[in-house]
């Protein structure tokens, strides 16, 4: 399957705008579950305000949050897809800039030292574009995540020792949620990476944070850890926006990687309550948009 780069550019633009305006169905369902179970009156009121904000944004074709975030694209390429990687990356970059200039959107991207903003949401190594490969022959999947600073500023890595065991992982995750408090705009999706090298562990935490609600870690030990950590986090009483309550997190998601015999790294990356994402799937039949 040959990829039309003009279509890719248009999709990259459309995905950024869609992600900022339309919340995925699984997140809306997550809100409904938390609202039904919440016992704290103030927390219930805060959840209701969040739910109304999402509905109003959708009805008025507005953004769910003023923070347009850092633009992150995950690209999965099927084995029979014909495309030049550099051309694909350039098309996504053009689409990202067009979304910002043509919508228009606030550009949240600046030079890390000079803090200069060129108002395109692009810059050095930005948008962040991550490539993976799939056995699905004629399919190209592009997923867009606008990552807000409230959740992204609350990211951690700890190079734990194997002798500390699983209890150290659990304690670290719980401590991170406590330290974050309301700064991540909870209820959050808590992404946890365990294992690998330092850089891989952090990347796993990010991919865990942006997984759909209801998904489970493929490894049974990871899935067990997810359930235990979700219970632990929601017993902390942080609550929506850090104002107290049962609804601190929609879920804790865990991703694992094999690691060195003398290491056990653990990383935490969070997604705020506006858990925004959008996707485009390219096949020989055309382009399909989703989440």
Per-region residue spans from a language model:
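Non-transmembrane, aqueous-exposed alpha-helical and coiled segments at domain scale
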Residues: 1-192, 197-291
């Amino acid at each position: 399957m040959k990829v039309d780069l003009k279509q890719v550019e248009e999709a990259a633009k459309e995905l950024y705008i869609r992600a900022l305006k339309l919340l995925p169905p699984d997140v809306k369902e997550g809100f409904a579950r938390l609202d039904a179970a919440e016992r704290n009156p103030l927390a219930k009121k805060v959840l209701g305000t969040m739910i109304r904000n999402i509905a109003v944004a959708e009805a008025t074709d507005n953004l769910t949050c003023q923070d347009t975030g850092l633009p992150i694209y995950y690209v999965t390429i099927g084995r029979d897809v014909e495309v030049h990687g550099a051309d694909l990356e350039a098309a996504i970059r053009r689409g990202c800039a067009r979304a910002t200039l043509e919508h228009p959107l606030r550009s949240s991207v600046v030079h890390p030292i000079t803090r200069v903003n060129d108002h395109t949401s692009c810059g050095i190594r930005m948008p962040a574009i991550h490539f993976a490969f799939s056995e699905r022959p004629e399919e190209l999947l592009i997923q867009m995540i606008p990552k807000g600073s409230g959740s992204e500023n609350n990211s951690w890595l700890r190079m734990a020792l194997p002798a500390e065991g699983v209890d150290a992982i659990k304690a670290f995750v719980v401590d991170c949620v406590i330290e974050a408090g309301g700064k991540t705009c909870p209820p959050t999706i808590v992404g946890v990476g365990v294992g690998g090298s330092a850089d891989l562990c952090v990347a796993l935490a990010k991919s865990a944070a942006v997984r759909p609600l209801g998904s489970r870690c493929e490894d049974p030990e990871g899935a067990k850890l997810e359930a235990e950590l979700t219970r632990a986090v929601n017993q902390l009483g942080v609550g929506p926006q850090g104002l107290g309550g049962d609804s601190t997190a929609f879920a804790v998601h865990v991703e694992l990687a094999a690691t060195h015999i003398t290491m056990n790294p653990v990383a935490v990356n969070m997604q705020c309550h506006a858990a925004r994402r959008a996707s485009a799937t390219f096949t020989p039949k055309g382009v399909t948009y989703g989440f």
